[in-house]
Amino acid sequence: MYQRKIERELRCPLEYGLDIFGGKWNSRIICILFIKGSLRYNELKAEMLDITDTVLSRTLKELMQNNMVERRQYNEIPMRVTYQLIEKAESVIPIFETICQWSKKYLAPDDINNSICGQFLKQDGEFFILAEE
């Protein structure tokens, strides 16, 4: 796993948040695990579509180090491992929902991709998946 040579200096809380759930893959993994629940590695990879094994594995390790994702290993043969969100990661879902609303407002309609990360909204305090249009 990549280790910084110089310790990162976080000057404000926004930098901390963006460091944890920013980037290309972190938010996608969090959204997918929120909507789909606990998934095995290959199930998660199938949802991601264009991610390599190396990048998915590294990103999951980083999310686990940041206490966003939990890896559960079951004592079964063959071995079964699942990944799921923990409370800290679930707490960023309202932030993602707000970002999705903002993006839909300012992004051209032709640029909107109906990816799973854009398919959740809040209604009466509960999140639900949008129907495909």
Question: What feature does the model see in each segment?
Answer:
Residues 8, 12-55, 82:
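N-terminal helix-turn-helix DNA-binding core of bacterial DNA-binding proteins
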Residues 56, 60-63:
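Basic amphipathic alpha-helical segments that dock to polyanions
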Residues 16-20, 45-47, 71, 107-114:
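Non-catalytic interaction surface on structured domains
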Residues 64-84:
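Beta-hairpin "wing" of winged helix-turn-helix
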Residues 1-9, 65, 70, 87-88, ...:
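C-terminal regulatory/oligomerization modules of transcriptional regulators
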